[in-house]
Structure formats: structure tokens, C-alpha cells
Amino acid sequence: RDLRYFHPNVRPDTHNRLLQECDEAFRRSNEIFVQHFRTKYTSEPYPPLWMMAEVMTYGQLFTMYRQLRNQEQKAIARSIGLQAPVLESWLHTLNYIRNAVAHHARLWNRQIPVRPMMPAQRHRPEFYTPLPIANDRMFGVLSLLRYMLSQVAPQSQWPQRLISLLDDYPDIPRLSMDFPEDWRDYSLWTL
């Protein structure tokens, strides 16, 4: 809420509108943790950010990240081994993907118009071994998700579930999604 954490170019009315939307989402929520907060912390006007993030839309989270000062963005990106512009581009791509999925859009053979920036090879060589991962098809998007999950939830079974899904449906046209034949052997997928 404190404008000191946000970029000086963010207009206060824009920032306040975002906060009002987030507050409204929290007020509407019937989640158990929200009910607990309301009953136990009656003197607290606002919930902690981790709690608020649970009820915010992806678009609101993305907007909040974009409004942060560069220093704050860098700290968040660094915590998952990325540079801030790379993380912002990934969040933008994932916002596009999320909206496409919500509207039942076809993605499997689509060229992704909101392309994620790939990290520099010297910072993240796993995106380049054995070959560079392209950023315009679903394999690139799935690869960045794989990387992010390895950083924030290393115990996640999502990579194994994706592999099982593709094994269960061998007729899925992987080439249209830019999956290389040996994708399972790529450094990123063996983390």
C-alpha cells in the first residue's frame, strides 16, 4: 500500500484503483483463511500481502509487480534466479496464456504473440543446452513454467504429470508445440 515501494511514475489514482479492486476481492472472498483473519484480527485494517495475493486475480498481481520500484522488482526476480526484465516478460506471457485458457482458446499449435524473453545464456545455461529453447511456442512456455516451479516449489510433481500426460496421449502433435524429440533430456527438464 505504501507508495514508497512503487515506481515514482505510478500515478496515485492508478495505484489506489488497484488497491480498491484488491480490497473488494478480499471483501467478497469466503475463503476460510479470510474468515479467520476477519474474526481474529478485527483491529487490523488490511490483511498481509501473502493473504491478499491468494484472492487477487493474476492480472492484479501482474499489475502490482509492474508498478513496483525497480529495486523491488529486481529483488523478486533475483529470488528465483532471473533478471527483472526477464521475469516481467514471463509474467506478461503467462497473463496472455492464462487469459487464452480462460476463454478456451487453442494453444497447442499457436505461435505465442506475447513472447517471453529468454534469460541470457551466461545466467541460465539450461535454456540453451543442448539447443536454445524457442520462445514462440508452447514448449517454451512450458519450459519457463518448469523453471519457475523448480525455484519456488522444487517438490512439485508438475513436470512428471506433464510427462505422464504426453505419454498417455502419444498422438498429441508435439512438433506443433515445438517439442524437440529429445526434450526430456534437455538440461532444464532434468533439474
In which residue ranges do the predicted regions lie?
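Long, contiguous internal "core" modules enriched in hydrophobic/ aromatic residues
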Residues: 1-191
